[in-house]
Regions:
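Regulatory and interdomain segments flanking nucleotide-handling catalytic cores
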Residues: 1-270
Length: 270
């Protein structure tokens, strides 16, 4: 009876928990800070660079730990993309939807909370920031790139609104277009274009190959007979995950190649 019970319970569980993303298709995840409006109370407006740097570091950690091809962060959200190379390519948690959602949310929350005291005062460390997550497939690389276009355009729209609200009461900017809010900012002597790129458009994080010699600490940790012991100039190829400044991605004509294949951007500024 116990075997039958176990099988039946597993059947119930797997009916939903066993769902996987489709192989070969690009996979996306988006994480959002939960109730960050309350969490960020009393921080500098329209943005606090300390919080922005912590979000970028959290994004770097997620790209590093999950093997995602590219990451993107703006405000209190992070987007990740995986581009499978073959049918049996492994992505995070083998594409299991519920495990990806719970694992990514837990990883982001744990890193953010652990590093929070290094970036923000003690009063913020006593709060409990958390992230939620959703994952999905898109049919093509171009659509995967368009997800990031969507998020970058959202970042631009939100940054204009946040800048305007930092200088005007809500009623003065309610219902105004982006151009109208920028005009209001000009009246206060503020040029939205002068804000840093991470606030206006967000930040991309990519996995890039780099060839470099071992560092002193890496050399120390090598086995005694390793070739680099005799030749410290020996170059090693590694994968590094780091922020990368890109032109506005909506203007990049080969954006899928730039984001997922490491191509140099070709931008249309007409």
């Amino acid at each position: 009876m116990s075997d039958g019970l176990a099988e039946r319970m597993k059947l119930y569980e797997s009916a939903e928990a066993g769902r996987r993303l489709m192989p070969l298709l690009p996979a996306l995840a988006r994480l959002d800070g939960r109730a960050f409006g309350s969490f960020t109370r009393n921080l500098a407006r329209p943005f606090d660079e300390r919080l922005s740097r912590l979000m970028i570091e959290t994004c770097v950690t997620l790209v590093t730990e999950t093997g995602s091809t590219v990451g993107y962060t703006q405000s209190d959200e992070i987007t990740l993309a995986w581009v499978p190379e073959a049918f049996d390519s492994q992505i995070f948690f083998d594409g299991r939807v519920q495990k990806m959602c719970s694992g990514l949310a837990a990883l982001a929350t744990a890193h953010f909370a652990r590093r929070l005291p290094a970036f923000l005062p003690t009063e913020f460390a006593e709060r409990v920031p958390t992230f939620d997550c959703r994952v999905w497939n898109v049919p093509t690389l171009e659509e995967a790139a368009n997800v990031l276009v969507w998020r970058e355009l959202d970042a631009t729209k939100n940054s204009i609104a946040m800048a305007a609200r930092a200088h005007y009461p809500h009623a003065a900017v309610h219902g105004k277009s982006g151009a109208e809010m920028q005009e209001l900012l000009f009246q206060k002597g503020v040029n939205w274009n002068d804000y840093p790129a991470f606030f206006k458009r967000g930040t991309y994080v990519r996995r890039l190959k780099e060839a470099r010699p071992f560092t002193a600490s890496e050399l120390e940790a090598l086995p005694p007979k390793h070739a680099a012991r005799a030749n410290p100039a020996l170059v090693v190829e590694r994968i590094a995950c780091a922020p990368e400044e890109l032109p506005p991605i909506v203007r990049v004509t080969n954006r899928a190649g730039v984001l997922f294949r490491g191509e140099a951007p070709r931008a249309d500024f007409t």
